[in-house]
């Protein structure tokens, strides 16, 4: 990121935790900020921004994500699965059937990875 933008974000994000843990079903989230993984220039920038945001819940577009990018990297190489609860999203789906199928695939992937978002 340019000109120390991440550092400014970190400074703004590091405030005293004044809200109780958010409970949604069996999930407990310290942050109310849910951040997506799309639209970043690189995986390194994404990881830096996620860290700076203080989020503990990250969405991943299952249908749009490539297995490997041109550099041979996978998005999962840059996400700390122990730190973040991953939520598969259905961006890019054009029908309800497609969205349900992609959501189920996402759940299976997270279950196989041992991520609590499954």
Task: Report residues per predicted region.
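Acidic-and-aromatic substrate-binding clefts and catalytic sites of carbohydrate-active enzymes
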Residues: 65-69
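N-terminal amphipathic alpha-helix/helix-capping segment at the start of soluble metabolic enzymes
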Residues: 2-36, 74
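Active-site mouth loops of central-metabolism enzymes
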Residues: 29-42, 64, 88-97
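Alpha/beta enzyme core
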Residues: 20-24, 38-60, 72-82, 94-118
């Amino acid at each position: 990121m340019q000109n120390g933008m991440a550092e400014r974000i970190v400074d703004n994000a590091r405030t005293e935790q004044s809200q109780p843990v958010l409970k949604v079903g069996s999930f407990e989230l310290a942050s109310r900020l849910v951040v997506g993984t799309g639209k970043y220039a690189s995986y390194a920038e994404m990881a830096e921004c996620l860290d700076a945001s203080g989020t503990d819940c990250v969405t991943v577009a299952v249908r749009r994500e490539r297995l490997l990018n041109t550099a041979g990297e996978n998005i999962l190489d840059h996400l700390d699965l122990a730190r973040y609860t991953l939520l598969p999203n259905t961006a890019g789906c054009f029908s309800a059937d497609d969205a349900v199928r992609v959501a189920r695939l996402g759940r299976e992937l997270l279950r196989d990875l041992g991520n609590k978002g499954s």
